[in-house]
Amino acid sequence: NVVYEDHFFTVYKEIKRLRSLLPLYYFGTEIGVNAIVLKYRIPSSTHQVNKSIAPLQDAQQAIYLARTNASEWGIDKNKIGIMGFSAGGHLASTAATHYEDIKVTNPGNTSYRPNFQILIYPVISFSSYGHKGSRDNLIGPVINEDQVHYFSNEEHINKNAPPAFLVHAKDDGAVLVANSINYYKQLLENQVAAELYLFEKGGHGFGMKNNTSEVHWPQLMQQWMIKNNIINK
């Protein structure tokens, strides 16, 4: 499972973020999931020809490496999924919906389609209800309708989209819950296996445990993965 975290800006923040992911690693190990963390490039006009595709290039390269090295790494190449939190959720959902638009070299004609997607309070859309900060960071403050459409991932779901598990809080003031709801609606319309869990409260960035609820979403995720034959009981 490739985990797309948000960007790391300093050594301190990198260590802090990696530590914050440890419970996820431990839980994954318990249920039989190996995690690969992707530290992807921050979009930058100074040294990238097209900064908007740099993160997607890194995501696709991560999927390529995982799939082509699956035997050596002891993983199932047909059960390689993606997981993203917040802005990392936008990258994960971009990889899940644009896997046929390959932005990297593919000498072995490897499939870039993830086998499943797990999105936790994700940025999905660059439309009116999307997250302006994520949009500006990726494509800039000047509105380009073609790019807004391209990176509004709810608009690119089809019947071949990977099965999806989503979690969001209704009172999320940073990334509106409409991101997950509209993505889920499109998954349903295209008859893609999907499950959405909405917390009444919790805001944004609650991580592995929403302290406002007795429900723990990692256990829900585990049951969903079992139902979809991703992991064993």
Where is each model-derived feature located?
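C-terminal catalytic histidine-bearing segment of alpha/beta-hydrolase fold enzymes
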Residues: 181-233
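Catalytic nucleophile-loop/oxyanion-hole region of alpha/beta-hydrolase
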Residues: 17-18, 24-25, 36-77, 210-216
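Short, surface-exposed "cap/lid" segments of acyl-processing enzymes
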Residues: 1-27
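Mobile cap/lid helix-loop segments that gate and shape the active-site cleft of serine hydrolases
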Residues: 122-156, 162, 189
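A fold-wide structural signal in alpha/beta-hydrolase
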Residues: 29-39, 81, 116, 195
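Short beta-strand/loop motif that positions the catalytic acidic residue
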Residues: 160, 165-168, 172
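Primarily recognizes the serine-hydrolase "nucleophile elbow" in alpha/beta-hydrolase
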Residues: 2, 61-131, 148-149
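Conserved alpha/beta-hydrolase "acid-adjacent" motif
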Residues: 173-179
